[in-house]
Amino acid sequence: MLKFQEESLRQSVNGALALRHQINPFLDAIFEKGITNVCFLGIGGTYASAMQTVSHMKEFTSMEVFAENAAEYITTGNRRIMDGTLLIYSSVTGSTPEIVKAVEKAHAAHATILAFLDNPNPHLRELCELCISYPQNEQLKLFMVADRILFLRHEFDCYDDCYENFDCYLADALISVEQSLDSFAQEFAKK
């Protein structure tokens, strides 16, 4: 396998899972304080990840949960983003103009902001109640937030078992999948 680093992938996934020690206390406190709705903000690929996370949550919850495209939000606004909104976003660069402007706008609307920044941006960090810098695993980070919210609302009762299994097996399962697809990928590339 070209450029495949098994131990690096294992450490990356397990490191992302360990972020729950930062995420969960924050969400527990926000939930106790009360949130009206949950918004996952993104642009391009991060918007696609936001939509996946919202689809997952909608399967379990009656709470208002939505994905917001950063470019649309800075252009047209969204009155649902306000005090009581938990806004979550992920950014690889931390410098995408639409994300920066959208986060500024959400901050001005008094939304509570949780950010995952692969490369920490000091300006964005100032606008967030919690900013976690950890590279890669965007979907996993967003799903950990979603699942914790569902758990706190008593809508995801298997949360503890699920994450106990993820802690034990997810990294190795993802490595196994990647290894098992290598021969398929080689054959596909020849065609």
Question: Could you describe each region identified by the protein language model?
Answer:
Residues F31-D167, A171:
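Glycine-rich phosphate-binding loops that contact phosphosugars or nucleotide phosphates
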Residues C131-M144, I175-K191:
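Short, intrinsically disordered, charge-balanced linker/junction segments flanking boundaries
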Residues M1-A18:
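N-terminal amphipathic/basic leader segments beginning at the initiator methionine
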Residues G15-G34, S176-K190:
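A short, well-structured juxtamembrane/interface segment
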